[in-house]
Amino acid sequence: MSEVRVRFAPSPTGSLHIGGARTALFNWLFARHNGGKFILRVDDTDLQRSTEESMKGILEGLKWLGIDWDEGPIYQSQRLEEYRKFANKLLKEGKAYYCFCTKEELEEMRKQAEKEGRPPMYTGKCRNLTKEQIEEYLRQGKKPVIRLKVPQQGKTVVHDIIRGDVEFDNSTFDDFIIMKSDNMPTYNFATVVDDYQMGITHVIRAEEHLSNTPKQILIFEALGLEIPQFAHVSMVLAPDRSKLSKRHGATSVQEFRDQGYLPEAIVNYITLLGWIPKDGEEIFDVSKSIKEFTLERVSKNPAIYDVQKLTWINGHYIRNYDLDKLTEVVIPFLKAKNFIGEDFDYDYIKKIVSVVREREKTLVDVADAMSYYFTEVNEYEEKGVKKYFTKEKVVDILKKAVVTLKEVEPFNKFTTEETYRKLVEELQISSGELFHPTRLAISGRTFGPGLFDIMELLGKERTIKRIEKAIDFIQKMRK
């Protein structure tokens, strides 16, 4: 096999969404698996809708996911002369022609087709204009489009690596436009010229592009160019099997980033949207994907987007992430919540992260779970208050805890646990009668990391103050 060359060609008219990210990833994995090249091309010929901001977001999203490119970004808007050159070649060879039909004429054709129960197609009115007619129209200042002369008989077959052979009857295509009247190429024409000039060997893209493929093959054939191999990956659908949209929650890479998902988790999850490793495992790193990725193992069936599964995978990565790396990525979320400023104790934060990460699913969750280490506890969980602060002996138990904790030295998770266990025996109560109200008093919550981990991280003074504050709260509540 010659060198594999694939491309990802986003339009900078919006965000990098989960479907686009998966297309980029599958191309990248295929290139890396085969020791080939991954090219980033920008389909920005729609100048009105293309924005720099959108392009910046797409590039940042790819970098964040770890999808690096070997060539590019190559902008179509900077290659307009190339498209004109190839269009002129087709005109010269009689494989394309100028069309001067007005909007009104085209509308009339559409209405006539509708009347006759035919699909609306261009009738080929300008297909056989004489050289003199063309010159006269041009002299009048009419701006033509250029149409491809599509064979009116036969079939065009897409040999698809994932879907097998897909046949299209040429009679279903009209002589479609390849260059618009403003001298800009159409999507299909620019795509073919680019794929040829960039030496693309495999076109891996979403199933929604399958209907474009026969038109692109017809252009390749008219130009006498070698046709690349095609692979159309299935759509990513919402859980109700409808088209994925904003109403189904976050769908862009930037939104996932802002909501505290890790790039490794996103990459792991979107790889599963249509592909699975040989051993069937659902958690795997990118090196395994590169080693095993083949198009033959990509599913034909639609992939169902499941945010709960993504969140479960993200939780796995949070629990197993390198602690320093996790601390680094949590810090911006702590700043966003004003828990810390620019001046902070990195080692202290790292210790807290190490104890809270076991239960959390996103970086936002991790930051939220750290709140009571940086802010005062001013309210307590209602269900905890009802369950633990209303018990008859709770004030006496907590008062005894304060007295006992004042004597603990050094104050760490081992000494506090030993002290509390002795106190339980001394008071002849269950451990829950002491542990649960203490947790609620010092954190405001009924759940979280180990109680004695929390005590150690809060320190002696804050732990005691918070228990005293809770005693005060309970006594006022009882009045």
UniProtKB/Swiss-Prot annotation:
Molecular function via GO: ATP binding; glutamate-tRNA ligase activity; tRNA binding; zinc ion binding
Keyword Ribosomal protein: no
Catalytic activity: tRNA(Glu) + L-glutamate + ATP = L-glutamyl-tRNA(Glu) + AMP + diphosphate
An individual GO BP term: glutamyl-tRNA aminoacylation
Pfam families assigned: Anticodon_2, tRNA-synt_1c
A GO cellular-component term linked to this record: cytosol
Binding site for ATP: 246
Compartments, record wording: Cytoplasm
CDD domains to which the protein is assigned, alphabetical: GluRS_core
Enzyme Commission numbers on file: 6.1.1.17
Coiled coil residues, start to end: none
Motif range ('HIGH' region): 10-20
HAMAP family reported in the protein's UniProt record: Glu_tRNA_synth_type1 (MF_00022)
UniProt function note: Catalyzes the attachment of glutamate to tRNA(Glu) in a two-step reaction: glutamate is first activated by ATP to form Glu-AMP and then transferred to the acceptor end of tRNA(Glu).
Assembly information from the UniProt record: Monomer.
NCBIfam families in alphabetical order: gltX_bact, PRK05710.1-4
UniProt similarity note: Belongs to the class-I aminoacyl-tRNA synthetase family. Glutamate--tRNA ligase type 1 subfamily.
Protein name: Glutamate--tRNA ligase 2
Gene assigned in the entry: gltX2
